[in-house]
Amino acid sequence: MNHLTLRGTHREMGFQWGARLAERGLRLLDHVPFFLTAERRAFAAACHPAYARHFPAALEELEGLAAGQNCRQEDLETVLFTTYALPPACGCSCLAVSNGNGVFFGRNSDFLTALEPDYTHVTYGFSDRAIPFTGNTTSFVQMEDAVNARGLAIGLTSVYTPRPRPGLNAGMVLRLLAETCAAVPEALDRLRVLPLASCQTLTLADAAGDIAVAECSPEGMRVERPGPAGPFICAANLFHSDLAVPLPPGPFSGPLMQGSSQ
C-alpha cells in the first residue's frame, strides 16, 4: 500500500499527488481496469454539474491532479464519476459496534483487487475550512473509508446500480461527508439532499457512539440502526430495505467493456 500526506488547498494537494506519481513514472490512466467508453464519457459529463454545485472542491483537486499528471482532467473525471455508478464489479464489507465503552469500526476492501498494488492511504491536511481526515482509496481523490479529525468514521460498500443517474457516486459522496461533517446525524442530513449517481451503503460511526448504515440509491435512502440482536450494524453488497426492489435497466446500464478505449 502507498502512503501519502498532503497539505494545502484542494488544488495544491491534487497537484502534489499527481506530481509525486509522475516522478516515479506512474500514470494513473495507465492503471484503469476498464475502458473509457463513449458511454462512460457521456455519463461523467452529465454528472459534472452536480459536482460543480455540491462539491466544487473536488473539481479543483482534479484540476491539480491533471496538471501534476500532465493529462486531461476530463479523463480523470470519466474514471472517477463512473467507477461506482457503472462498476465492473461490486465489493467490500463494513461493520461497526458501539457498546457504551467505545466504538469499533471495521472495513474489508475487495473492490477492484487488480489494483491492489496501487491502493493508497492518504492523510489530508486542508489549509481552508475542510475537516482534516485520513482515508483509503483504490484509485484517487475518491475514498472508500475515512476517519476525520472530529471523530466521524465512514466506510462504503458497493451495490449494483440498475438505473444510474447523473450525480455524486459512492466514493465521492464519502469523501464529501468526511471533510464537511462531524457526526452521524449531520452526515445523514447532508446525504439526504445530495443527488446520487450510484447504489451503495455507507456505514457511519462517530465519537459520541452513534452508529448507522445508510442504504443509498438514486431513488432514495433508508437508514438502518442497531436492532434487538445487539449494538452493531453491518453491510455488504446488497440492501436489506425495500430499496432492493429490482428496477428495469436504465440508459446507462448496458455493456461497459466495449467501445472506444482510453
Predicted regions and their residues:
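C-terminal, well-structured catalytic/ligand-binding subdomain of enzymes
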Residues: 1-71, 82, 99-104, 108-262
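Short, glycine/charge-rich beta-strand/loop segments that flank catalytic centers
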Residues: 74-95
